């Protein structure tokens, strides 16, 4: 847009072009245009689930975008929409959503980029704050023919589980080429993730974390009264299901095929009465070596 600041801006293609240094512009003209484009999106395309503003930086943050006005307009047209936190921050920031005084445009979730936080996010009263880790498949958001540093499907699956176990979500980027084709490497990775999800999606969709300690060999996700122990490494002498007692267990099953697993009751574990142990395989190999 001709009224978007160019010279010296962090993002503009002409940011280093001296010819643009003294070019006059009226930023309000750009904001009128931008607000109009957002109004069009919220009006002409049915019910929208999410509005993802990306992103704020330097002096262009918060009310520099007329953010309160913008959010009021979006929510008036799409009352059920979810909005990210980047009208006041970027991928490295959390914004006022995590403070005692969230702004009118703080959004509905935190969006850490290219990192999974060590813990989830809570407000000052200890309530969970929604968040979403924004992750690329390789090292670029857009298509990059030379970038072959793709994360393996096994890693992405485990990181997805990690996000959910911390009450978060994962946004996974796919960068199509100029013709709209998804790279073969991405397709292979997505197919492997899809195959795992076909068997294990109940442990992801609708789930979050719990207050139990993280197992040494995996993660825990939860949906209501159901705990999903994600076993990523086998144990010797039985797999301990930390945090629960035997009298709390109604049943234990492999989510992939429904096989019932009986708690171990033998001499090996008899001196650990406060721990539930299970054996999910008759060999040292787990049924799913990525995440059982």
For the regions a language model picked out, list residue spans one by one.
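Mature catalytic domains of secreted/periplasmic carbohydrate-active enzymes
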Residues: 1-292
């Amino acid at each position: 847009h001709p009224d978007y600041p160019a010279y010296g801006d962090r993002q503009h293609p002409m940011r280093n072009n001296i010819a643009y240094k003294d070019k006059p512009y009226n930023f309000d003209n750009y904001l009128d245009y931008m607000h109009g484009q957002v109004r069009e999106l919220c009006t002409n395309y049915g019910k929208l689930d999410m509005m993802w503003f990306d992103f704020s930086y330097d002096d262009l943050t918060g009310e520099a975008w007329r953010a309160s006005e913008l959010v009021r307009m979006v929510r008036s047209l799409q009352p059920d929409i979810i909005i990210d936190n980047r009208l006041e921050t970027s991928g490295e920031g959390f914004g006022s959503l995590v403070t005692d005084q969230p702004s009118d445009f703080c959004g509905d979730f935190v969006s850490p980029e290219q990192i999974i936080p060590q813990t989830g996010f809570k407000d000052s009263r200890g309530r969970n704050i929604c968040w979403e880790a924004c992750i690329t498949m390789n090292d670029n958001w857009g298509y990059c023919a030379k970038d072959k540093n793709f994360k393996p499907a096994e890693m992405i699956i485990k990181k997805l589980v990690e996000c959910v176990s911390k009450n978060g979500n994962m946004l996974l980027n796919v960068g199509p080429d100029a013709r709209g084709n998804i790279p073969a490497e991405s397709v292979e990775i997505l197919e492997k993730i899809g195959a795992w999800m076909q068997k294990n999606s109940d442990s992801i969709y609708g789930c979050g974390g719990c207050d139990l300690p993280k197992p040494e060999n995996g993660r825990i996700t939860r949906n209501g009264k159901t705990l999903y122990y994600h076993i990523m490494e086998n144990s010797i002498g039985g797999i301990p299901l930390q945090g629960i007692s035997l009298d709390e267990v109604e049943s234990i099953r492999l989510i992939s095929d429904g096989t019932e697993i009986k708690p171990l009751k033998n001499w090996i574990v008899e001196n650990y009465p406060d721990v539930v142990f299970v054996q999910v395989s008759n060999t040292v190999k787990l049924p799913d070596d990525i995440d059982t």
